[in-house]
Amino acid sequence: MALGRHLSLRGLCVLLLGTMVGGQALELRLKDGVHRCEGRVEVKHQGEWGTVDGYRWTLKDASVVCRQLGCGAAIGFPGGAYFGPGLGPIWLLYTSCEGTESTVSDCEHSNIKDYRNDGYNHGRDAGVVCSGFVRLAGGDGPCSGRVEVHSGEAWIPVSDGNFTLATAQIICAELGCGKAVSVLGHELFRESSAQVWAEEFRCEGEEPELWVCPRVPCPGGTCHHSGSAQVVCSAYSEVRLMTNGSSQCEGQVEMNISGQWRALCASHWSLANANVICRQLGCGVAISTPGGPHLVEEGDQILTARFHCSGAESFLWSCPVTALGGPDCSHGNTASVICSGNQIQVLPQCNDSVSQPTGSAASEDSAPYCSDSRQLRLVDGGGPCAGRVEILDQGSWGTICDDGWDLDDARVVCRQLGCGEALNATGSAHFGAGSGPIWLDNLNCTGKESHVWRCPSRGWGQHNCRHKQDAGVICSEFLALRMVSEDQQCAGWLEVFYNGTWGSVCRNPMEDITVSTICRQLGCGDSGTLNSSVALREGFRPQWVDRIQCRKTDTSLWQCPSDPWNYNSCSPKEEAYIWCADSRQIRLVDGGGRCSGRVEILDQGSWGTICDDRWDLDDARVVCKQLGCGEALDATVSSFFGTGSGPIWLDEVNCRGEESQVWRCPSWGWRQHNCNHQEDAGVICSGFVRLAGGDGPCSGRVEVHSGEAWTPVSDGNFTLPTAQVICAELGCGKAVSVLGHMPFRESDGQVWAEEFRCDGGEPELWSCPRVPCPGGTCLHSGAAQVVCSVYTEVQLMKNGTSQCEGQVEMKISGRWRALCASHWSLANANVVCRQLGCGVAISTPRGPHLVEGGDQISTAQFHCSGAESFLWSCPVTALGGPDCSHGNTASVICSGNHTQVLPQCNDFLSQPAGSAASEESSPYCSDSRQLRLVDGGGPCGGRVEILDQGSWGTICDDDWDLDDARVVCRQLGCGEALNATGSAHFGAGSGPIWLDDLNCTGKESHVWRCPSRGWGRHDCRHKEDAGVICSEFLALRMVSEDQQCAGWLEVFYNGTWGSVCRSPMEDITVSVICRQLGCGDSGSLNTSVGLREGSRPRWVDLIQCRKMDTSLWQCPSGPWKYSSCSPKEEAYISCEGRRPKSCPTAAACTDREKLRLRGGDSECSGRVEVWHNGSWGTVCDDSWSLAEAEVVCQQLGCGQALEAVRSAAFGPGNGSIWLDEVQCGGRESSLWDCVAEPWGQSDCKHEEDAGVRCSGVRTTLPTTTAGTRTTSNSLPGIFSLPGVLCLILGSLLFLVLVILVTQLLRWRAERRALSSYEDALAEAVYEELDYLLTQKEGLGSPDQMTDVPDENYDDAEEVPVPGTPSPSQGNEEEVPPEKEDGVRSSQTGSFLNFSREAANPGEGEESFWLLQGKKGDAGYDDVELSALGTSPVTFS
């Protein structure tokens, strides 16, 4: 044993006097490293940052730092101010972490003070090098592979379910691997066998690293996936012209590869490659590629990668590259280029076959030899990176047929043109029909070819197509430009659409000529100004490009030189806000909406009106078109919408109806008039959007008005939030469904040329963000169709005695109407009660006593199952109902705070003709099956289970898809189906499997009415159980950096975390929230907290909980929507309780991590402390023996127990005494499996704290070396008798050695004496056991073995081996089967579930009593040795 070297007095002193600092975790940071996860460790105390002294700094301390910072695993722990000396205080002299703590505050450490006052300096400042939070594993290098993040314990793969390119970009940038080239599923790399990370990352693409990206927890703790996400990065991140070049547009080519600059070899270097670099650097085009060493420095590292550019790429790393197999490169043969700067030069479009002199770069005079003169372009797509594919051959441009056309083919086209990744491969002449020859047909590219004409095909010019089958592509480098402002068209924040995302433009430096180019491109006049005094813009977005310097010859922003495009080209305060000269604005006021009212124009800072002389429908058409308000319905005069104020800008306006702006129509001239404000003109427009072709104004094909005609909107990327905005704008309630072109006749007109990207909180469709479709035509299979609920609210009103009793009224298209009782049932009534938060329905009384005669009656018939959350979620028959008398209107009496279970029935109801279901007539249930979702964390996500004939069973996932999931979500009133999961995603169920091969259309009322194999027929097992995730899945949390029971209140709804509004939020509501979160019974609303940063949904307002509510979901509230209030009204709650942490670490933990030793001379000796109810506490030494110590040592992985220490020998602990009268058998795997008094119940003081000393040592503490400053000077009086301590330790070591030698001698002697009599001696063993049992019954024999007192080691042979039962334990009682052989049952009551009673040894059993060293055969010798943690040994 090597215990001696671990027991230096200095190390023991430090361990004993290490002070635990309570309160919140110390704030940490790493400084002066190359990234966030390495550097000098600094601690913030009293508002000031200071360092940690590197004395005794270990990998375990570094591991805790990395875990606290979310930086993965510790891979280095340099001291000696490796990252430079810090400034300011030295706050910590040492830390003593075990390595499993979640924060440094959980470790023992020195008092926090400035140790510079004690003579210490920054020369030993501690540092850390962490692995980082994310890595790419399993690929061909650090820049490609499976995405894995570090939990603080292990690397865990990330699901590919909702993994985005924006997230991949963050990962590649963080790893120094350039930009993301592709995001793949599990097929490229070997799938990890570990679990999948339980969160989805929602990066926007601008974050500095993955750790700070927003995250969303996966329902049930497991993300839906088909494998782990895979990312391939480019590795190349920057390019420059450097060294001896005379300017930034001339010099040697160098690339930043994984953080290092390297020169590029001239092998295969061509003018086409050089042209790409000049374009990328904003240096015009390449003039020449000079050879020779005059541009080269000998110290450069040479990169032998060979690029194969066509010359049209935007970035060098967009070109095909051969990274392997290149020859060695001399310094005289590195690539260089001289760019034109601001000259314009056209580069021939050639393929990548270049004639090059051996051993030298292409010279300035040698033009590239083009072995293939074909050229490629995209036309009619609105830009060079989207459109119909055309190839030039033999002087003629021709097209490609769409037979077999797919993304692999499109990838080749996009790569060849330098347009990034392929987003879409279009067919059917999506960008219009071409003309001329059709060059290719039946193309079958692998996606890796350098040119599209090198892919397999029918042959050049061979086809069976017409131009209506012309192929097209949309690439990621497609660009667009806009200004963003709430109320202006020609002034606002300048944004570009790039790489699939809108982002801002930087203003530094932006001269007048650049602003003029932008204004002309946007049709906003010929000049403008840059506004640098506008307030900082809210929210986050990319800043795509900086240093734009347009020239007089440029006609668009895309032609202007600039810095390279990247995600963060500047800071948010440098985003450009531009005013163009033509910045007049127009609005309609006092008309009740944006699209009707008095016409007003803003000019030179003043709003003025238009005189109504000659004002007619043609003038109104121009106004409606200009505002995006559809067609003109009326042109009002004589101040129909009230009189305005300010100037009268126009009079005698005489538009033709075709003008783009009303001030461009003929008139008397600006400010020329003979009117007053009694003659102010107005308009009434139809509005921007309508639903057409349905059965009313609230369902149908989505159409928007272009100013000329109604145009349908594409269903390609149409979303539910967009539908919600449309329904709300039209006064049609909420969106029930979004469909394709099936239910309604497709319009003959063109499709709207933009995609709407509504968040759901916009007041109207016009104000939603939009993205232009490439080529002006959106990809679609038809027009988008929306069905709105029409019904927006429900109430119980009139003669009812409370809000939970009365006549049922519904708000239909903005008007309240009573509901006829036709088909009114208790199931329908129960949904109304639930929706209003009024409990369940008690009865549905009929008769006029709850009715007023003036009500309008709705004859809609609802067919609820009773489980829906909203009445309008039920199937409804709106047409064909009979007339309804006022005496037959629906009514209900709800329980209020009563609880009553409603039978789950289908929608077939027996009802008397002409009357509502009476209170006495219970519904007739033709089908008593029930449906539920389990193990998903809420009622709207989980494994699908059906109750039939008293048994809950599951559905097999064969053919399980979103149509099936839609039926389930609708049936449960859980909104839209977001995901249909298979493979027991929410865990395997039990019981029968009721359905298999389900094939729903999505419109069935109940899932068991869908076509299937038949009830109970299947060929599945429960590992194929189906599940769903619905949009109404809810969760609740508080968000705070350092508190568990205080923070910003957030709900998870519709797939996103969002905040809760605080107005009005009374004490009872706060109490319900605190109880639901396990944070006590009361709390307070904090209104003085600062405004929260960032943007998020604000899902719900006006929450008013009642005394009977047990969760937030039961409380009445305002309607749930995206923006229910302003950011300053978000709720911040502080609860009085403190939710106890279930684990001492941040992550899930095992029993081993809930047990520790403190105050000892090594990590395997000390006072026993256990974690319970959120805090560490001690164990009382009553009944504490070597058996209990053995369990502790084994649980901690510290070998065998050497001593069971009592009487607080390692110092008294503090806090609770969690356990008393612990009684173990010695074989338990965990202390929790032993019998004990109930948690926290003891009659002890800390002077009786139990401890252990184990044989093993898990860590090695550094010994003190000469010349190292000791801590005894600053910490006096730790040990007054060091000699006594050494004597005790030496004695213990000696006794342990004596015990081991004695045991080995006994075993060896017995084996030699008995080796020839194995059978006879085995019989003798059992006789001896019987004799021992007889002896134990007496309890008075002096020969009996007893527990050895702490100080008694006189008789080594009688020291009980761990696990030996106490003599006080009888053996006559029959031991229950669940306690035999140490098998544990679940912990119940006050016991830690294992009895110290030993089972009777039976035939074939290995009893613990055999470990007492009695005679036995060789098999028992093996057991004896194993009990001491030693491998069986054969002695000769």
From Swiss-Prot:
Pfam families: SRCR. GO terms for cellular component: external side of plasma membrane; extracellular region. Residues 1384-1393 have a biased composition (Polar residues). Residues 1348-1358 have a biased composition (Acidic residues). Expressed on subsets of CD4-CD8- gamma delta T lymphocytes. Gene3D superfamilies: SRCR-like domain. It is found in: Secreted. Glycans are attached at residues 162, 244, 256, 351, 424, 444, 499, 531, 717, 799, 897, 979, 999, 1054, 1086, 1173, 1214, 1393. Residues 1-25 form the signal peptide. Keywords: Disulfide bond, Glycoprotein, Repeat, Secreted, Signal. Residues 28-131, 134-234, 239-340, 376-476, 481-581, 586-686, 689-789, 794-895, 931-1031, 1036-1136, 1155-1255 form the SRCR domain. Its main location: secreted. Residues 1337-1410 are annotated as: Disordered. InterPro entries: SRCR, SRCR-like_dom_sf. This is Antigen WC1.1.
